[in-house]
Curated annotation (Swiss-Prot):
GO biological process, one term: regulation of DNA repair
Family affiliation: Belongs to the RecX family.
Coiled coil: none
Record protein name field: Regulatory protein RecX
InterPro entries the record matches: RecX_HTH_1st, RecX_HTH_2nd, RecX_HTH_3rd, Regulatory_RecX, WH-like_DNA-bd_sf
Length: 162
């Protein structure tokens, strides 16, 4: 057998992507906050000044928008069964200020108490928690998912007489 050298690969040669192209590649997949986008660019070895300039440019051109990102997070997390306290905390970790968080929370069209009830019905069946230990378990579970006390009481039918 003849040993042959492998043929040179044909095809496109990829040029090194600019910071703006890398950031745009991230934004095409899903929304990102400014802080998250900057952090991801830095993790990919882009210089801090270039990363910040890329984020500023994409924000100025409308590709990145913290309000749009926050509304998407609220919609996604509420649909996944998380309550308002959990969602607010998550938005805070993305570097959003309290005004942006409040505006995003106002975009939610549903009812937090109804969401909590739906979760309880899915977890405990149509009858819901029957006795006090089950109600406590349900209340603890909702609290861990970020629901407030009023929603928890309404969803678990928790009365002070119990």
């Amino acid at each position: 057998m003849n040993e042959q050298e492998p043929a040179p690969k044909r095809g496109r040669r990829f040029k090194e992507q600019t910071p703006v192209q890398r950031a745009l590649g991230l934004l095409v997949r899903r929304e990102h906050s400014r802080k998250e986008l900057n952090r991801k660019l830095l993790a990919r070895g882009i210089e801090p000044d270039a990363a910040q300039a890329a984020v500023d440019r994409l924000t100025g051109e409308g590709w990145q928008d913290d309000a749009r990102f926050a509304a998407a997070v609220v919609r996604n997390r509420a649909g996944s069964g998380y309550g308002p306290l959990h969602i607010r905390a998550e938005l805070g970790t993305h570097g959003l200020d309290s005004e942006a968080i409040s505006a995003a929370m106002a975009t939610f069209q549903g009812d937090w108490t109804e969401n909590a009830r739906d979760l309880i019905h899915r977890r405990f069946g149509e009858q819901g928690p029957i006795d006090l230990p089950q109600r406590r378990k349900a209340a603890d579970w909702l609290a861990r998912r970020g629901f407030d006390g009023n929603s928890i009481r309404a969803a678990t039918r928790f009365d002070l007489e119990d």
